């Protein structure tokens, strides 16, 4: 495997590290009382400020003209795949935990795969070993997500956070993210998180089609952020009229907004567009379980969130499912390449025979 073919793997790993930090820092500011709708507006606005100059200087001359139909498509993608997805994700994260956010995001492989099948961007040959591997992988991923959502089991004792155990209460006991797995708040958060990821999966699948008619990735991402910032502002101002909730000080809130705006919405979204163009939406979503592993350990150390047996078992199932699907896709791509080579050889033989007959 040469360096060029390794780039998509490197990019998706970087994307998952970026998202891990996002889960942690977002949960921290929500624990501190920041309004989730205001947070989404600020992160999208900062992303627009960051990307607009880059798009102007680097793609001003190469960007194709934007038709009205394409603009409407991008507007709807921004509304459902970015604005509403982020708003629902923010609410769900305030109800649950950073680990659950990463875990339910790992359901993206199943969501994206079925949506890609629906839109004809993926195929599934159940009778082939590749198709069976992909189907088994998706099923295992879904099983892992279900276990993470409904089963906790024994707690893993970490010496860094001893107050979890021996009957002592967690200092954030009033935070919905630390309530028992059977509580209404926890289940509500799970439902909202899954809905958010369904919208996100739809965004991943459909933006591939839009990029074919508007291939300027930087302009595309900038327009996404601009439209989303306008949409999220309308939602936030309608639901939060308290001026104090909109103030940003020199604290973690400002750091979170800048990071999520510049790095997540700006850099990660651009990298996602690049990976989707090179390898497709399902390849990108297959690496989301990596952020679960990173978040599981980081949240336990930095946010003192509970690591349970259910989290470990669910995470292992997600990783197993990930590599089942990746193996199936790699075999499928290899066979497709071999078929093209065989077809070319057959064409060459036919051409040579025709030349002999003519001569």
Curated annotation (Swiss-Prot):
Family: Belongs to the drug/metabolite transporter (DMT) superfamily. Plant drug/metabolite exporter (P-DME) (TC 2.A.7.4) family.
Residue ranges occupied by any EamA domain in the UniProt entry: 18-136, 198-326
Bilayer topology: Multi-pass membrane protein
Keyword terms, alphabetized: Membrane, Repeat, Transmembrane, Transmembrane helix
One matching Pfam family: EamA
PANTHER family: WAT1-RELATED PROTEIN
GO molecular function: transmembrane transporter activity
Subcellular localization, as worded in the UniProt entry: Membrane
Protein name per the record: WAT1-related protein At5g64700
Top-rank taxon, per record: Eukaryota
GO cellular component: membrane
UniProt cross-references to InterPro entries, sorted A to Z: EamA_dom (IPR000620), WAT1-related (IPR030184)
Membrane-crossing segments per the record: 10-30, 37-57, 66-86, 100-120, 135-155, 186-206, 218-238, 256-276, 282-302, 306-326
């Amino acid at each position: 495997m040469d360096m060029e073919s390794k780039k998509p793997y490197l990019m998706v790993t970087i994307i998952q590290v970026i998202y891990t930090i996002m889960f942690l820092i977002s949960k921290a500011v929500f624990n501190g009382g920041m309004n989730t709708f205001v947070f989404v507006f600020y992160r999208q606005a900062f992303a627009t400020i960051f990307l607009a100059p880059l798009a102007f200087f680097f793609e001003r001359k190469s960007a194709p003209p934007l038709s009205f139909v394409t603009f409407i498509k991008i507007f709807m993608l921004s509304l459902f795949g970015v604005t509403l997805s982020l708003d629902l994700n923010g609410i769900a994260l305030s109800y649950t935990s950073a680990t659950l956010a990463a875990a339910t995001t790992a359901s993206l492989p199943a969501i994206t795969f079925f949506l890609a099948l629906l839109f004809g961007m993926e195929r599934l040959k159940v009778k082939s070993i590749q198709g069976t591997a992909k189907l088994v992988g998706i099923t295992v991923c879904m099983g892992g997500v279900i276990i993470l959502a409904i089963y906790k089991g024994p707690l893993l004792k970490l010496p860094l956070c001893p107050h979890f155990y021996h009957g002592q209460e967690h200092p954030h006991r009033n935070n919905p993210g630390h309530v028992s797995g059977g509580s209404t708040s926890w289940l509500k958060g799970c439902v909202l998180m899954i809905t958010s990821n369904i919208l996100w999966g739809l965004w991943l699948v459909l933006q591939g089609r839009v990029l074919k008619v508007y291939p300027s990735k930087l302009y595309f991402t900038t327009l996404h952020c601009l439209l989303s910032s306008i949409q999220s502002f309308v939602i936030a101002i309608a639901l939060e009229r308290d001026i104090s909730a909109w103030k940003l000080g020199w604290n973690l809130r400002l750091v979170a907004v800048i990071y999520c705006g510049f790095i997540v919405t700006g850099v990660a979204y651009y990298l996602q567009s690049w990976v989707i163009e090179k390898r497709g939406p399902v390849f990108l979503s297959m690496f989301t379980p990596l952020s679960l592993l990173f978040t599981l350990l980081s949240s336990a150390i930095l946010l003192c969130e509970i690591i349970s047996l259910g989290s470990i078992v669910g995470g292992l199932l997600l990783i197993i499912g990930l590599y089942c699907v990746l193996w199936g896709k790699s075999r499928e791509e290899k066979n497709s390449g071999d078929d093209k080579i065989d077809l070319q050889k057959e064409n060459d033989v036919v051409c040579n025979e025709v030349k002999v007959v003519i001569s």
